[in-house]
Amino acid sequence: IPSERLMRALNTRLPPEIAATGCREVPPEFHARYSCAGKRYRYRILNAPVRDPFWEGLALYWPRPLDAGLLDRQAKDFLGTHDFSAFRNAGSGVEDPVRTVFECGVTRAGDLVELTVAGDGFLYNMVRIMAGTLLDMARGSVPVGSIPEILESRDRSRAGMTAPACGLILEKVFYPKL
């Protein structure tokens, strides 16, 4: 089947919130999950005094003030290669919790605050726990500046909450040139 035709056929079967935007032939040993070189996630927070129904299910509603500049500075502590044991779901069966985060930042556009995280791989709930830790810093239940110590501790109880799934988006999957 030609790639272009396969892509059109896929899109007739996919739900409206998912679209195939490209398609190409790959070698037989290619695996969509295990052949990827990295991923980029975005966690969206609607930071406004009043809930916006158009963002329901697409972003976490957070009515308390957020200092995106402060959160961005804290998020930079996630950059690099670390043991992310403190930022994974308790009981996770992954043997090697070491991951490399090569992009991490917080931006604001109006009422929308976004955490963007890209890395070579992610543990279960890792991005949601990173987002929850930053939000807990904003409300004072996790000390500002404590991310390096939390990483070093490898202790899940030292990190913040697991932010709700509603704000999380897998934005891009990176593959090596085939």
Model-derived regions: residue spans:
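Structured-RNA-binding interfaces characteristic of tRNA pseudouridine synthases
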Residues: 1-178
